[in-house]
């Protein structure tokens, strides 16, 4: 059983996992993407890190610093993992998830939901019509540009 399961590996999830671990909790961090960092991976402008790291960093640089701090701990991380269900139990919660290893579940005393933000498609907000091939949301376009 975990003390804390953090769902989401963006800036808030990373900070929560590191803080909980620092307080002595046994922590699992679950992230649906192949990489940690969340929205920060898209923020190529600088200005991050002035307070925490005392220097001006881009979003990806800032997230890498937190990822490095995370991997200095014994927090368990599951990438490419999608939470399918959360059940309240007598002793906490059961979190069901699926990943490349198949379907599984874990028990935890507490949950931190740090699922972040992402843009929604026209269909998700009930705008009728079709999207032409090659048209992306701003966030998707930023992500592709930053990967190149």
Regions flagged by a language model, labelled:
Residues 1-5, 64-69, 73-148:
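FAD-binding core/adjacent interface of flavoenzyme oxidoreductases
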Residues 2-65:
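Beta1-alpha1 glycine-rich phosphate/pyrophosphate-binding loop at the start
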């Amino acid at each position: 059983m975990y003390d804390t399961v953090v769902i989401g590996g963006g800036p808030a999830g990373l900070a929560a996992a590191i803080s909980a671990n620092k307080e002595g909790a046994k922590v699992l961090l679950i992230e649906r993407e192949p990489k940690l960092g969340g929205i920060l991976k898209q923020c190529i402008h600088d200005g991050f890190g002035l307070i925490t790291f005392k220097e001006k960093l881009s979003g990806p640089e800032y997230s890498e610093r937190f990822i490095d701090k995370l991997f200095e701990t014994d927090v368990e991380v599951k990438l490419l993992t999608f939470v399918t269900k959360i059940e309240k139990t007598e002793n906490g919660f059961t979190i069901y998830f699926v990943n490349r290893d198949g379907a599984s579940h874990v028990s935890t005393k507490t949950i931190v939901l740090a699922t972040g933000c992402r843009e929604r498609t026209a269909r998700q907000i009930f705008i009728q019509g079709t999207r032409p091939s090659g048209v992306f949301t701003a966030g998707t376009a930023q992500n592709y540009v930053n990967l190149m």
